[in-house]
Swiss-Prot record:
CDD domains: NAD_bind_m-THF_DH_Cyclohyd. InterPro entries: Aminoacid_DH-like_N_sf, NAD(P)-bd_dom_sf, THF_DH/CycHdrlase, THF_DH/CycHdrlase_cat_dom, THF_DH/CycHdrlase_NAD-bd_dom. One of its GO terms (molecular function) is methylenetetrahydrofolate dehydrogenase (NADP+) activity. This is Bifunctional protein FolD. It comes from Dictyoglomus turgidum (strain DSM 6724 / Z-1310). The gene is folD. NADP(+) binds at residues 164-166, 189, 230. Gene3D superfamilies: Leucine Dehydrogenase, chain A, domain 1, NAD(P)-binding Rossmann-like Domain. Its EC number is 1.5.1.5, 3.5.4.9. GO terms for cellular component: cytosol. Keywords: Amino-acid biosynthesis, Histidine biosynthesis, Hydrolase, Methionine biosynthesis, Multifunctional enzyme, NADP, One-carbon metabolism, Oxidoreductase, Purine biosynthesis. Pathway: One-carbon metabolism; tetrahydrofolate interconversion. Belongs to the tetrahydrofolate dehydrogenase/cyclohydrolase family.
């Protein structure tokens, strides 16, 4: 059986570092504060917000909420973002998805203040990532790096295959790995003969959003498998990789739940503390 790369010890290490930084800022009279912006009603978005609130409250980060009805105009939304940019007591801003069609069409995320963009979704932060400059990294891709670093799995010179090309995971993750001198192949729904790529990977990262998509016939001996998928099947959280099928064939594998997901919220907190430093400078 392959070694299971549990996310919990990674999260605990990061949490310890985060708490130390929070105490430092509080000793300077600064209370790290995240503003969560929600438009309309969505049960999944609200559940996500509450999970952040619960963890952040536990470690000493202040949370503010701004809720708006789905009729809010793009002009008014832009004004709100400007107010949050100018509010020195707010260090980070997180906009929950989904947004109403008008806001999505109007690229509302681009009104986020760049130095408070704790999810790294603005064009400026994504551009900085592209050229390898200091920026806020999207949380899930950074969580993958934190896990690889913790378990001392090098990526330099490695053949890494990323299955999935979303702007929130696949694309930024491929750039982060490229910046670490990995050799990257990005596969997606239009890739022909996908199995030829997945079986040859030294490190296979799956973020395609399809439960149990990768089975034993798609992996090779001795691989590192990172499952970024979060899908609900019969009321249970499952990954994009069929864990039970694959675990005995590969060298390392992350579980779902208990893998990347538990690290992601800690990365969000790390990004907020990075924003505190920028805002308070």
């Amino acid at each position: 059986m392959g070694v299971i790369l549990e996310g919990k010890p990674v999260a605990e290490k990061l949490e310890k570092e985060i708490k130390e930084k929070i105490q430092f800022y509080k000793s300077q009279g600064v209370i790290p504060t995240l503003c969560i912006v929600k438009v309309g009603k969505n049960a999944e978005a609200e559940a996500y917000a509450k999970s952040i609130e619960k963890f952040f409250s536990k470690i000493g980060i202040n949370i503010e909420r701004k809720n708006f009805n789905e009729e809010i105009s793009l002009v008014d939304f832009k004004k709100i973002m400007k107010e949050l940019e100018e509010d020195s007591a707010i260090h980070g801003v997180l906009i929950l998805r989904p947004l109403p069609e008008e806001l999505e069409r109007g690229k509302a995320f681009q009104f986020l203040p760049t130095k408070k963009d704790v999810e790294g979704v603005t064009y400026e932060n994504l551009g900085r990532l592209l050229v390898g400059e200091d920026s806020f990294h999207p949380c899930t891709p950074q969580a993958v790096l934190e896990l690889l670093d913790f378990y001392q799995i090098p990526v330099e010179g490695k053949n890494v295959v990323v299955v999935g090309r979303s702007i929130s995971v696949g694309k930024p993750l491929s750039l982060l790995l490229l910046n670490r001198n990995a050799t990257i192949t990005v596969c997606h729904s239009k890739t022909k003969n996908l199995v030829e790529f997945t079986k040859k990977a030294e490190i296979l990262i799956v973020a395609i959003g399809k439960p149990y998509f990768v089975g034993k016939d798609m992996v090779g001996e001795g691989q590192v498998i990172i499952d970024v998928g979060t899908n609900v099947v019969d009321g249970k959280l499952v990954g994009d990789v069929n864990f039970e099928e694959v675990k005995d064939k590969v060298e390392y594998i992350t579980p779902v739940p208990g893998g990347i997901g538990v690290i992601t919220t800690r990365v969000l907190a790390m990004n907020l503390l990075k924003a505190v430093k920028k805002v308070e400078a």
